[in-house]
Amino acid sequence: MAKKGFGGGMMPGGGNMNNLLKQAQKMQENMQKAQQELESKEVEASVGGGAVTVKVNGKKEVIDITIKPEVVDPDDIEMLQDLVLSAVNQALRNIDDIQASQMSKVTGGMNIPGLF
């Protein structure tokens, strides 16, 4: 009597493996779509009462920095550097938060390492 090889018949549960594969493919498509949408987003962060504003896109590229002329003090460059650094870091945190929220919606709250 010949033995059936692995997978030589219906999976227990009536083909749940096919459904699982379809769900995984759909999730992958949704993640790619969400990633494309995220890359087109732009986020701003302002510090120092609006003295410095930084805009980043979903690719985490700084696309604009606005500095009010009144904060440019040649005798205190360090303060301006701190404001720019703070604004850049805040803008990056903002885009990270948006990305995490968007991916959580796509993955149904599953934490999948390395998505972004």
UniProtKB/Swiss-Prot annotation:
This is Nucleoid-associated protein CD630_00170. PANTHER family: NUCLEOID-ASSOCIATED PROTEIN YBAB (PTHR33449:SF1). Belongs to the YbaB/EbfC family. It comes from Clostridioides difficile (strain 630). The keyword Membrane does not apply. SUPFAM superfamilies: YbaB-like. The keyword S-adenosyl-L-methionine does not apply. NCBIfam families: DNA_YbaB_EbfC. Transmembrane segments: none annotated. InterPro entries: YbaB-like_sf (IPR036894), YbaB/EbfC (IPR004401). Homodimer. Binds to DNA and alters its conformation. May be involved in regulation of gene expression, nucleoid organization and DNA protection. GO terms for molecular function: DNA binding. It is found in: Cytoplasm, Nucleoid. GO terms for cellular component: bacterial nucleoid; cytosol. Keywords: Cytoplasm, DNA-binding.
